[in-house]
Amino acid sequence: MNIFDPQGPVAAADKVILIDSIAIMLAIVVPTIVAIFAFAYWFRASNPRAQYLPDFAHSGRIELVVWSIPALTIILLGGVAWIGSHQLDPAAPVAGTGSPVRIQVVSLDWKWLFIYPDQRIATVNTITVPVGAPIQFELTSSSVLNAFFIPQFGSMIYTMNGMTTQLNLQADAPGTFFGESSHYSGDGFSDMHFPVRAVPEDQFTAWVADTRKTGPTLDAAAYGQLSEQNRSMQAITYRAADPGLFTQIVTQKLPPGPGPSTGRPSLAVSPRSEN
C-alpha cells in the first residue's frame, strides 16, 4: 500500500498534492525550529551582546511577520486543496484508452461484491481490470457506512446504504495491487481487503470469457446468502449476474445485510463469553 508509488493518473495527481502540501508546511516548520535554537543560543546568559529589553511592548514589523506568514500558508494550502479537489472530482471521467469498464460495488459485512453489468458477471473480494481503460465505479452499501480505497490507483470514496457514489480511476501498468476498506465497519473490518489485478486488454477479455464458463449465478437468492455476516471470505467469481441486482440493492427492494447487532458483533462470526 504505497501511496508514493502511484499506478494511475488520479493517484499521481494525489501524490503531487500531498508533496506540495508538505513542502508548504515545511517552509514554515523548518524555519520555526531553526529560530527556536537560534534564539536559545543568542539569548544565552553568557552572551554579552544580547540585549534585554524589559519595557518592549509592540513592534509593527513583528506583527506583520507573525500574521502574514500564517495567512499566506493558509492561502497556499487552501489553493492547493481547492484546485486539487475540483480537478480530481471522483465523479469526473478519466481520459484513458479503450472502452470504459463499469463496476458496481457493494460493501457487505464483511466483504466486497463487484458486479460487471456490461459483462454480466460478478466477483467477491477480487477485481480484474484492463490496463489503460477508464474504470467507472458505482458504489453503495448493503449495511453500515464504509469506504472503498485502492491506494495506488487514487482517491477513496464512501459507500452508503440507500444511495450511490461514483469514482473514476485508471490503472497505468499491469500488476496486482492492494484494495481495502478504509472505514471501520465492525468486527470483520480488518478482513475487508482484496487484490486488484490490472491486465492487458486481451487478458481481460479472456478472463471474462473464462469466468462465464464456470461458477454459480448471482441472483436475489444468492445475494441474500452473500449478505449474511461472515469473516475471512475467500474470493468468488459468478459466471452470471442479474443486471438489475445493483438497482434493487440501492433502492432497498432486497433485504439489506443485517448489520452489526446493537452494541455488539454477531456471535456467529465472533463468539465471546459474557463476563
Which ranges hold each PLM region?
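Non-transmembrane, membrane-proximal soluble domains of secreted or membrane proteins
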Residues: 1-19, 40-275
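Alpha-helical transmembrane segments
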Residues: 18-45
